[in-house]
Amino acid sequence: MENQPEKESWVYVAVENPGGNESFVGLADEQSGIAYIPAFSTKDDAQACFINMPREAGKKYEIQAVIFEDLARDAAANGFLIFILDKDGKINNKIDPTEIQGSSQ
């Protein structure tokens, strides 16, 4: 498993409705009921994997860089885990953002 990103490091995520009422793209594993935000170590990995991710027709998406701690805060507030994926969609790390939030308080 890949190491967890540092709080201050950049990760890459898909954003829905960029520039407007934007939000991070979250997915759910229907079998386990786990909701997660896919994140990537590099923009290239994010773009390569995003091509194969489910999307809603008619919505705009964009890959954006975000500070890992900011992503963790939003994920925790909305009940999502963070999965660090590679370009093929393989899970490199599963992160519970509530553990990150707890360590920063």
Regions found by a protein language model. Give the residues of each.
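Conserved NAD+-utilizing ADP-ribose enzyme module
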Residues: 1-105
